[in-house]
Amino acid sequence: MIITRNWLKKYLNLDNISNDQINVALNSLGFEVDNVYDLNSLNSELVLGYVEQSKQIPDTHLKLNKVNIGTKSLQIVCGASNVDVNQFVIVAPINATIANGLTLTSKKIQNYESQGMICALNEIGINQSVINKEDQLKIYNVFDKNLDLKKYLGKDVKQIIGLDDYLFEIDLTLNRSDCLASFQILKELANYFDLEIKNYDNKFNDFKENDLDLKITISKKIEEQIKTISYSNFVLNNHLNKLDSIDDIFLKLNQISSTNNLINDLSLLSTLSTAQTHILIDLDKLKSFNLKLELINHNDKELLCLTSDNQIVNIIGLQTESKFSIDNNSKNVLNIMVNIEPNLMRKQQKLLNTSNINLQRYIKPINPNLFDLANLNLTSLLNSYNLVNKAYKVKVLKQTYKNKTEFEIKISEINDLLGTNLTIDQIKSLFKKLDFKITNKNDLLTFNIDPNRIDISSKNDLCEEVARLYSYDNIQEVALSFTSFKKPKNLNLKLENKLTNYLIGLGFNNTKTYSLTTQIDAKHWNLFNISDFINLLSPLSNLRQTYRTSLSKSLIDTAIYNHSINNKELKLFEIADIYNLNQLKQRHLVFLTSHHIYKNGLTHQLVENNFYYNKEILESIFDLYNLDFSQIKYVNNLDVIKEIHLYINATIYYQKQLVGFIYQLNPKFESENKLNKTFVCEINLDVLNELKNKTIEAKTLSKFQSSSRDLTIEISNDLIYQDVLLKAISDVKYITSSKVVDLYLDDKLAKNNTKALTIQFIFNDLDHQLTEAEINTEFEKIISNVKKMKVVIR
């Protein structure tokens, strides 16, 4: 959103307010100012000129022009195709520096002395993207219906066309979509600086009763997504199809291309002010006043359109189709205003693959009941160009949205929530220039909300608005105080909820599977050595006969089913209980990953699933339970069921108690069931709850840069990695952490009952920045310790 100082000056007295103050105000009010632009400084000198003579230079595309700049006439050679006599133009005289960096000098072109330059807009700082293609190579003709431009020859043309302006480019949050109407930002600044808004009510007031019998039928498919439909109409006087330069430049400064149609351009100016879009139609071109709003298949896209007799009148978000659009001869103009569910319009924008002033407002949550304000503003703009012969009131065809405009809240509630001691008078003064009305009965405040503020829907929103206007910087920082209540504690449940949220945050899907399985599977998948199975006396099926003894098989079956329906990128987890006849109730977690763990649809970047990704998730869970990692042991088990990979598996122990298992499925089993590479981890949460460290210790973080060293070793499968690691780092200083970053297996290693591990060691210190010499000394100790264990270093 762009706001300019000159536009604000039309309504506010800014004589004592600088651009920096406006910048600070906008940021203080929560409107982040991304950029500011001082247009006046782009060009050192530009004056208004009048082309008195223009002659073609033989055998060239150039013209020799005599340009009157008031005190004298200049001879200027110009190559623009549209330069001609009787034009008011922008002239950069000799020694002037213009926005494209060119400093003008007197020089000869085709043996003719050229004493300056007649300028096009893209040469003086206007973005070429908002200049129509046919105008990009043309000089700009200055026009103003209210000025006798001959009296201004030689004067600063920047003031005449609005290039002496200062721009504020504002980033709006979604909840402040109302400020897509510049009138809303105007009110915010008036309130901030305590200024009276002038000329705001200087509007057209001679509206006639609307007797036009127009019907717009809404397709049932989209009926609930259309919030409001209304219309008005105008009878126009004869008119020139030319926008004043100051208005034309203002549109371009707002990144909007003018349409070369005066009425359409004025509607765009109105939309900037009110945020309500206008669909303008030449009434005389309509054969029927029965229109329809429906989804139409147009160019193989299902687009929301306004139609008449099965002909598209307007694709919502774009200009009216030429067959029905207004032109220089239009006398009777229909103005349709709609408000549509933003989700539908976001889909429309995606299909149209474009962005414009109308679509930018259709896709945002804006007050659906802006039609009266918008019609008034558009009519006033038309009237300022002496275009209005008759103007008619708005007729509303559909209005489902009702503004919630009133809230009651006690002053104590506001102060308690914000930590302030505001009085009723102070709160009233915060909203002095805004369209809020505040009354009170004793300490009960009644707020009548600005109907444009549809983001305020609760008391908390209202308190946030008070804080914003009061300024967060003015709210004293006070440490939180807690009142403790004696409540039964269930730390285990809290940890489980955190665990669930953690996995969901990683992209896992929470699943629920059958607790009953076959008796054979219950025995085969009895990883945790559960005894005394629970068998149903009268099972409905042999497939659902026995309570399961682990969760793994259920999740693997879920993965197999998903692969069969081509859903292969899987992250699944389940938390459930295991039972037996001896009143055992064991809480288990199982998670499964299959195929790629990361897939970027845009760049086609893929990251393959691997053991260490799953192990890292597991260790994050251990960290949640505050376990001592030095007490965790991973033991490779060669005596596993056939569905589990013989080498890529580990039985997990903590303080010598069985915690669970982590493994890859056997490639043969994966192939038989058309699974991609799949890893499974199942752990007993009851063991974690029993052995967790309830004492949370705050550790000092080093402010110095850490360094790492990698070491690759060949280790026997008979050795326990944790034991090897503890011996390796014995008496080594500055170690903050270590982890396995790679595992390698080949036929030779497998034959020797070994595997290759790459371990990464992280070094740091709390007191000083470690030198390379210190790190290398300690790393040599690790190497020495490893060699003492007769472990091969690769």
Swiss-Prot record:
SUPFAM superfamilies from the xrefs?
Anticodon-binding domain of PheRS (SSF54991), Class II aaRS and biotin synthetases (SSF55681), Nucleic acid-binding proteins (SSF50249), PheT/TilS domain (SSF56037), Putative DNA-binding domain (SSF46955)
**What's an example GO cellular component term for this entry?**
phenylalanine-tRNA ligase complex
The cofactors named for this UniProt entry are:
Mg(2+)
This entry's Enzyme Commission designation comes to: 6.1.1.20
Name the SMART domains on file. B5 (SM00874), FDX-ACB (SM00896)
Would I find Membrane among this entry's keywords? Answer: no
Under the heading InterPro entries, the entry gives:
aa-tRNA-synth_II/BPL/LPL, DNA-bd_dom_put_sf, Fdx_antiC-bd, Fdx_antiC-bd_sf, NA-bd_OB-fold, Phe-tRNA-ligase_IIc_bsu, Phe-tRNA-ligase_IIc_bsu_bact, Phe-tRNA_synthase-like_B3/B4
Give the reactions, separated by semicolons, that this protein catalyses: tRNA(Phe) + L-phenylalanine + ATP = L-phenylalanyl-tRNA(Phe) + AMP + diphosphate + H(+)
- Domain B5 per the UniProt entry, residue ranges: 402-477
One GO biological-process annotation of the entry reads: phenylalanyl-tRNA aminoacylation
Q: What is its main location?
A: cytoplasm
Task: Specify the tRNA-binding domain's residue ranges.
Answer: 40-158
Enumerate the subcellular locations listed in this protein's record, separating them with semicolons.
Cytoplasm
Give the cofactor note text.
Binds 2 magnesium ions per tetramer.
Which intervals hold domain FDX-ACB? 702-794
* Oligomer status and interactors: Tetramer of two alpha and two beta subunits.
Which protein family is named in the record?
Belongs to the phenylalanyl-tRNA synthetase beta subunit family. Type 1 subfamily.
Q: What is this protein called?
A: Phenylalanine--tRNA ligase beta subunit
UniProt source species? Mycoplasma capricolum subsp. capricolum (strain California kid / ATCC 27343 / NCTC 10154)
